[in-house]
Every structure is written in C-alpha cells, then in structure tokens.
Amino acid sequence: MPTSFPELDLENFEYDDSAEACYLGDIVAFGTIFLSIFYSLVFTFGLVGNLLVVLALTNSRKSKSITDIYLLNLALSDLLFVATLPFWTHYLISHEGLHNAMCKLTTAFFFIGFFGGIFFITVISIDRYLAIVLAANSMNNRTVQHGVTISLGVWAAAILVASPQFMFTKRKDNECLGDYPEVLQEIWPVLRNSEVNILGFVLPLLIMSFCYFRIVRTLFSCKNRKKARAIRLILLVVVVFFLFWTPYNIVIFLETLKFYNFFPSCGMKRDLRWALSVTETVAFSHCCLNPFIYAFAGEKFRRYLRHLYNKCLAVLCGRPVHAGFSTESQRSRQDSILSSLTHYTSEGEGSLLL
C-alpha cells in the first residue's frame, strides 16, 4: 500500500547497503491483522459520519454560507480518502496487488483526499481570520460564489500537489508501489516525503497558528458569545487534526533520514517500522473524527441529527413527522432573529453546522 510515504511492502526482511538482513516479519504480520481491522472500522465510521455531514449541508432549506461550502468540501475530501481504505484492506489481507489502473487510481484518490482535507482545513482557518479579524473589510468578499470558486481552486491544487505521489505508481511484482526511473530512484522518495512534511504539515501549521493567534487576540476584546461558539468548533477541528497527524509526520521525517543511513542498526529500523504502523493508525482515523466534533460542539448539527432520527423513527412507526418540522422551523426563526441582531459578525457565523 502506498501509504505516505515509504510504500508499505509486505517483505519480511529489509536489507542495508552491506546486504545485512533485518527481520521484520512480526511487524508485517501485526500490520496485516491490526491494520485490516482498523481500516475497516475507519471506513465504516468515516463513511457514515461524513455522509451525515453532507446530508446536513445539502438537505437544509436555509441559505448556505461560505463556511458551509468549505465544510462540505472538507467532508467530501474525507470521503474520498476513506473510500480507498477497502482496497488497501483487500491488499493487506490477500497479498495480491491491485490491477495496474486501479492501483494508480486508488493511490491518486488517497493523496488527493489527503491533501484536500489539509488544504480545506487551512482555508477554513483563513476564512475564520477574515470573518473575525477583518470582518468589516472582508464581508462583501465572503460570499457563496467566492467559496465555490476558492473550493475549485483548492481541489485543483490538491490534484497538482498529489500528482508526484502517484504519477509513478504501478503494479510491480504483485505489489502497488512506485516504479521510478533510474535517475530518480534515490531522490524521488525523499522529495515525496519532503512534500508531505512541508506542504501537508509545516506550512499549514504556520498559517493556522498565525490565523488563530490573531483570532484569539480579537476574541479577547469582543465578548460576542455566538462568535466564540463558532470559533470553538473550527478550532477544535484544527487542533484534533494536528494532534493526530503530528506523530505520523515526525515518523515520515525520520523515514526520510533513513535514506541517508541515519538509522543503520536493525533495532532502530524495527522501531521505526513499529512507529510507522502505530502512528499511521492514529493519523488515518482523522477522516472519521470531524463528524463527531460537529456533533459534540455544533448545536445545529446535533439538532439535525435529532430531527433525522425522529423522522426515521416516525416513518418506521407510521407516525406523521410534521411536529418535528414545526419545531425546526420555530428554531430556525429564532436563529434568524439572532443572526439579525449580530449581523456585523459577517456571513460566516451563519453556518448550518455551528
């Protein structure tokens, strides 16, 4: 499986320049069993949770905000990422490589979803900065039309940045891995890892840190409770993302150093492979966490889930569902009144999930 970043091969031994064998069979066996179970769980929860987010955003009759556009695309990125996990599970269990076209396509979806999720979380942070810190100057520019245009640009950027990760991927020796030209054999894996560390972690972290530092400073001077509640949700999404991806990026950086023989001993190589397996499980689970964050911190999303549950229960029991719609409409009118009282906080605070 082309995980980030060294490909996950199924070989039981790793050889250094002196042809000394390092046994990794027990780690490979652990990965085959544990990762297969873990991928199945992440796929199930990630699919259901992110589909609920998509339904909540697309089925609402209320007008959308630019924040909703970004949250919708974040959920779609997570769905694209999680959709590849059944194929990697099959690959781990059967030890059979995917068809060449499916190998390249699945790897492409994996990395496009990976970078797309990171980029949209970064864009959401920038949007929060504009909505809170530069509210007066950015109000006219934070429209749904602008959100759609920016989202298309983000998807294009994700495809462009992901292309080095899958352009050389093919089925080789019954495995799905990178088959690089001889001139790129040594440098291309290093460039791939560096791209993930820099564009997928360091640069977004710097941007988000700046945006949220300025946002926190602004919130200290503004006691608008509605605005603080909106920031709590978005900030929670960002913090959880980096808590789950930081260990993996550290291991990827160490894997890059391994190409330059920084870890010559077999024990260090084994520790690094164990760390890769463990941090990978933590990192990949991020794609099913955002819906739970919405349910925990987003009042409107919890309300939508209750409404959906009551509607399904009413259909199963043969009861009418008008009461639920009436209550929802009443609350929507209350939200509209609150929005009119706090209109200066800009359009972004009117997200359907916040």
Curated annotation (Swiss-Prot):
Pfam families listed in its UniProt record: 7tm_1
Post-translational changes noted in the entry: This protein is not N-glycosylated which is unusual for G-protein-coupled receptors.
Ranges facing Cytoplasmic side: 61-70, 127-143, 217-232, 299-354
Gene Ontology biological process terms in this record: adaptive immune response; antifungal innate immune response; autocrine signaling; brain development; calcium-mediated signaling; cell adhesion; cell chemotaxis; cell-cell adhesion
Membrane-spanning parts: 33-60, 71-91, 105-126, 144-168, 197-216, 233-257, 275-298
CDD domains, per database record: 7tmA_CX3CR1
UniProt tissue specificity: Most abundant in adult spinal cord, brain, kidney, gut, uterus and testes.
GO cellular component: cell surface; dendritic tree; external side of plasma membrane; neuronal cell body membrane; perinuclear region of cytoplasm; plasma membrane
Molecular function in Gene Ontology: C-C chemokine binding; C-C chemokine receptor activity; C-X3-C chemokine binding; C-X3-C chemokine receptor activity; chemokine receptor activity; CX3C chemokine receptor binding; cytokine receptor activity; G protein-coupled receptor activity
Cystine bridges: 103-176
Extracellular side: 1-32, 92-104, 169-196, 258-274
Superkingdom of the organism of origin: Eukaryota
Compartments where found: Cell membrane
Subunit: Found in a ternary complex with CX3CL1 and ITGAV:ITGB3 or ITGA4:ITGB1.
Function: Receptor for the C-X3-C chemokine fractalkine (CX3CL1) present on many early leukocyte cells; CX3CR1-CX3CL1 signaling exerts distinct functions in different tissue compartments, such as immune response, inflammation, cell adhesion and chemotaxis. CX3CR1-CX3CL1 signaling mediates cell migratory functions. Responsible for the recruitment of natural killer (NK) cells to inflamed tissues. Acts as a regulator of inflammation process leading to atherogenesis by mediating macrophage and monocyte recruitment to inflamed atherosclerotic plaques, promoting cell survival.
Protein name as catalogued: CX3C chemokine receptor 1
Organism: Rattus norvegicus (Rat)
Name of encoding gene: Cx3cr1
